[in-house]
Every structure is written in structure tokens, then in C-alpha cells.
A protein has these predicted regions:
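C-terminal non-catalytic regions of proteins with extracellular/luminal or membrane-system context
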Residues: 1-300
Length: 300
């Protein structure tokens, strides 16, 4: 970071070396806030609600990140603004699931908008003003600490990578997302307790909108099995449905489990195999919860 004084010229020399990727240089500048004593925390303190939008652009297709942290200056800005106004809404725009632990409890709410297109501003405004009830779910896992992840040069997913194999506590699980309303799930019910061969099994759950707003919920169906756990597999998503439920109403949501959902690669015979045994199918709002019913697959 180089402070620049008005009216002065500066000679900047940048050296870069790239073996395979074309090197790019980007210059950005930030006007000082204190010309007239106006600072972000002062504006926040004088406001009923503070909205702080932070963007992260430290990664791209042509290069990797050094770590999964927000910048120290950004974290300090969050601390100053939320201290000045506890009623702060933090909007985060990033293409990666970055670490949120240093500030996750500071704002009143966090809206993660990823990297939007030209309609991003309108979409965000509609959510903030209550014209749209948010229903998005995280397509990745937000870990509590980057040390929970295996080395990034290891592509072995079975070593604790993703919601399928990681067994520790996370910040926000795969499939997580809040709404302005509140949904409740009944216990799932299956139409049969045993299946074999190419049979299918239906699992049904009732989702009720117990809040004060109409809303959409993304109902998710996960499958797990003790025999999978031997190889480290915790669970896998086999289906999801977006359903609209008016306030005070309920909807029945069903999923079909088929033999293809049970398949695992058998290294001994080098083919996909559906192992006989007990399975659990769980219908939940995200991968961090469990609302399961069991059935038995009898094999071919």
C-alpha cells in the first residue's frame, strides 16, 4: 500500500515473472475518508442501520489464493463499523468460501452474495427491503478454520474434503441458508422398509411454514450407510427440491431412492456395486442436520 499525495507524480516499477500464465498488473486506489472527518464508523454511528459491503477479488482462474482469509484491513473495518452500530448488515461478495470466524458474530446479519451479474444490486436491494424472501443455500461448506482442510495439493476427497467426508464441526454446512420465515420438517416416512434389485423406494416428509412470511425452501435428501462409513463416506446428496410454502401452510415433499443411488465403486471387481445392508435416508434443510429413516437393501 502506497500513500499518494495530490499533485505529485510517482514512478512505479513492477516486476513479474511467469512460466506458463500471462502476468497481469492491476492498480487500485482508495480515497482517504478523513478529509472532512467522515469515516465509515462515524457514518455508521449516525445511522439507524449500517450496511457494509465487502468484495474479495484476490483469486482468479489464473492464480491461487495464498490463504482463505479476508484482509486484515477489511476485518478491522467490520469491527469498527459494528462497534459503532450493532445494527449492521454485512454483505459479502466473494468467489470462495472464506473464513468468517474473526467477525461472524459481530454484525446483525450476513448476506453472502458471491459474485453477481449486472442485476446484483437490484437483487440485493429487494432482499434487504423484504420484497424477496431469501431462499439460497450454500453450494459449498464454510469451514471454521482452514486448518480443518487437508493440503490443497491433495486431490484425495476421502481425506476429509467436502460435506461427504469431513466429520468435524464447521461454520456453515453444505446446503445451509436462512430465510425470513421458519420451516419445520416432520419425520420422514418410507413406503417400504426393504428393497432389492432394481426396486425403488419413496420417502416423504411434510414441510410446514411456521413463520410470518411466504417463502421457498430447498428440501434436501441425503443417503448414508454403515458400510459406506468404512471407506470414510459420511453421506451424499441424492436429491433436492425447491418448494413454495405460504405462511401457515404445509407441503408434502417426496423423493425416490433407486439402486443407482446406492452404487459405490468396488476396487476389487472394478465395477459399480450396490452393497446389501442397512441404509438411512435423511430429508433435511441442510447437510448439518439429520432427520432419517432406515431401510434395508437386500442386494440383487
Amino acid at each position: 500500500e502506497l500513500p499518494l499525495v495530490k499533485g505529485q507524480e510517482y514512478q512505479v516499477e513492477v516486476e513479474a515473472c511467469g512460466m506458463k500464465a500471462q502476468q497481469t498488473v492491476r492498480l487500485s486506489w482508495r480515497p482517504p475518508f478523513d478529509d472532512k472527518g467522515i469515516t465509515p464508523e462515524k457514518l455508521a454511528k449516525e445511522s439507524d442501520v449500517a450496511i457494509l459491503f465487502l468484495r474479495d477479488d484476490n483469486s482468479s482462474e489464473g492464480r491461487d489464493r495464498k490463504d482463505l482469509h479476508w484482509g486484515e484491513a477489511q476485518i478491522e473495518l467490520i469491527r469498527k463499523v459494528t462497534e459503532a452500530n450493532p445494527n449492521t448488515i454485512l454483505i459479502l461478495g466473494s468467489g470462495s468460501p472464506l473464513m468468517l470466524a474473526p467477525f461472524v458474530r459481530l454484525p446483525k446479519a450476513i448476506l453472502n452474495v458471491w459474485i453477481g451479474g449486472q442485476g446484483e444490486a437490484r437483487a440485493i436491494t429487494h432482499i434487504l427491503l423484504g420484497k424477496v424472501n431469501p431462499s439460497g443455500k450454500t453450494p459449498v461448506t464454510f469451514f471454521a478454520d482452514e486448518r480443518q482442510l487437508p493440503p490443497m495439493d491433495s486431490y484425495d476427497v476421502t481425506k476429509g474434503r467436502s460435506y461427504q467426508y469431513f466429520k468435524g464441526d464447521v461454520m456453515f454446512p453444505f446446503g445451509y441458508g436462512l430465510s425470513y420465515t421458519r420451516f419445520e420438517y416432520s419425520r420422514p416416512v418410507v413406503d417400504k422398509s426393504r428393497m432389492s434389485g432394481s426396486d425403488t423406494l419413496s420417502v416423504e416428509v411434510t414441510v410446514s411454514n411456521k413463520g410470518g412470511y411466504d417463502g421457498e425452501e430447498i428440501v434436501q435428501c441425503y443417503l448414508s450407510a454403515p458400510q459406506w462409513a468404512v471407506g470414510g463416506l459420511k453421506q451424499k446428496l441424492i436429491g433436492h427440491k425447491r418448494v413454495f410454502i405460504a405462511k401457515g401452510e404445509s407441503r408434502k415433499v417426496s423423493f425416490t431412492v433407486c439402486r443407482e443411488d446406492l452404487l459405490r465403486w468396488n476396487v476389487n471387481v472394478k465395477e459399480w456395486t450396490a452393497l446389501a445392508g442397512k441404509y438411512e435416508v435423511s430429508v433435511v434443510p441442510h447437510s448439518g442436520e439429520k432427520n432419517a429413516v432406515s431401510f434395508v437393501y437386500e442386494g440383487k
